Structures are given as structure tokens and as C-alpha cells.
């Protein structure tokens, strides 16, 4: 392709468990392979799955048949979606990204969400798939701001992540309108819709999708006046 002067890419590859003859490339190997001057800057993430649980955590609905994952993308990143972001993400400014899907077997901590907010300044949708509780329980940390976040989905996440985002002293979400969550998590974080620490964020929501049957108490409607 002699006329090609620009090639932007986002490549996600997986290696099956039964492919024992394949040698895995390291991050360093991948970076060296893109050193030629005609290539643009490239970022890469290489992960190894040691058991079915870890593999399931990383790739969610995909089969438990993989034992490694490699994500390579050109910089600047020109795509609107960033799929399967894990704790291996090293940061960087990806201004075009509007939607991020986070998943891992290890917990996402407060400081990592700070990296996410800085790396994706235009983020509008965040989906978190992580059943591990956070290890850092102190809430007197630096306030994190997601200035453009409109949609938050923590339905498949531990209750700690709902707390992380809904407590206004942890996260400032001035444009959040849509929340997807389990009823158990919502009732816990809001203390049955009486917690003042989550009231401000919840009061601005216009759409709440709740998994699980429930009879909303009177305080529910007062807590979500825009529903």
C-alpha cells in the first residue's frame, strides 16, 4: 500500500489455553517491533490469565478458553470506545474516548479512578464489571471529577464502586443522568435512601435502571425527584 500515509488501529488479540507451543511476546517486544520510523507511537498491554476465574473476570462473556491477551493501539488514540480496560492500563491522554468498559479480577482503587478521569477527559459512559471489594476504604481522599460522565453502569460491580461514584465527596459527577445498578447496592450505599452523602448525585438523575424486584419506599421518590 504505497499510498498509505496514516494507519490508526486498535487491536485486541487472545491466545487459547491449548496453544502451548506459542511463545508470548512481552510489552517490550511489542514496542520494539514498532520502532521503525514509518510507524506512529504505539501503546501496548500484555496480560496472562492463570486460571478460569481470572480469565472470566477479564473478558466477561467470552469463553474461558484463553490464557493471554494483548491489546495494541496507535497514538493518538482515535476511537470513541476503549474496551476491556484493566489495572494494567498505564494512563495517557485519550481525548477521543467517550465510552470505557472496565473489568479485572483485582479491585479498582480510588487512585486508579483518578488515572481514568485524567486519561479520558471527555468520557461520557463508564461500565464497571468487577466483583472484588476495594481495599482502600478511606473516603477522605482527593476528589475525582468526571466532568462529562452521563451514563454509569455498576450493575455487575461490587457495592464499593457504587459508593465510590455516588458519594459526592469521592467523585464529582456534574452531568450524570443515567445509572444502572442492583437494588441491593443502591439501598446499601444510600442507607435506604436517607444518606446525605449520596443525595446530591442521586437528586440529579433522570433515569435509574435497577436490577431486582422491590417496592420503593416513600423516601425513594424524595431521593430521586427527577425520575
What are these regions (language model features)?
Residues 1-227:
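Eukaryote-biased activation of long, low-complexity terminal tails and linkers
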Amino acid at each position: 500500500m504505497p499510498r498509505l500515509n496514516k494507519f490508526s488501529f486498535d487491536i485486541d488479540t487472545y491466545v487459547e489455553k491449548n496453544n502451548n507451543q506459542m511463545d508470548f511476546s512481552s510489552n517490550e517486544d511489542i514496542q520494539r517491533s514498532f520502532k521503525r520510523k514509518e510507524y506512529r507511537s504505539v501503546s501496548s498491554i500484555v496480560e496472562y490469565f492463570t486460571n478460569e476465574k481470572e480469565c472470566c473476570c477479564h473478558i466477561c462473556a467470552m469463553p474461558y478458553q484463553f490464557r493471554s491477551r494483548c491489546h495494541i493501539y496507535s497514538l493518538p488514540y482515535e476511537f470513541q470506545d476503549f474496551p476491556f480496560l484493566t489495572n494494567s492500563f498505564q494512563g495517557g491522554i485519550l481525548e477521543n474516548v467517550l465510552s470505557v468498559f472496565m473489568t479485572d479480577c483485582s479491585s479498582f482503587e480510588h487512585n486508579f479512578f483518578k488515572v481514568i478521569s485524567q486519561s479520558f477527559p471527555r468520557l461520557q459512559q463508564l461500565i464497571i464489571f468487577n466483583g472484588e471489594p476495594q481495599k482502600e476504604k478511606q473516603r477522605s481522599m482527593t476528589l475525582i471529577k468526571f466532568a462529562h460522565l452521563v451514563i454509569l453502569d455498576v450493575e455487575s460491580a461490587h457495592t464499593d464502586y457504587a459508593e465510590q461514584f455516588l458519594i459526592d465527596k469521592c467523585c464529582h459527577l456534574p452531568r450524570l443522568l443515567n445509572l444502572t445498578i442492583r437494588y441491593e447496592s443502591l439501598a446499601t450505599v444510600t442507607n435506604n435512601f436517607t444518606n446525605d452523602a449520596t443525595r446530591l448525585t442521586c437528586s440529579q438523575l433522570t433515569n435509574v435502571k435497577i436490577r431486582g424486584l422491590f417496592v420503593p419506599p416513600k423516601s425513594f421518590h424524595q431521593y430521586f425527584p427527577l425520575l
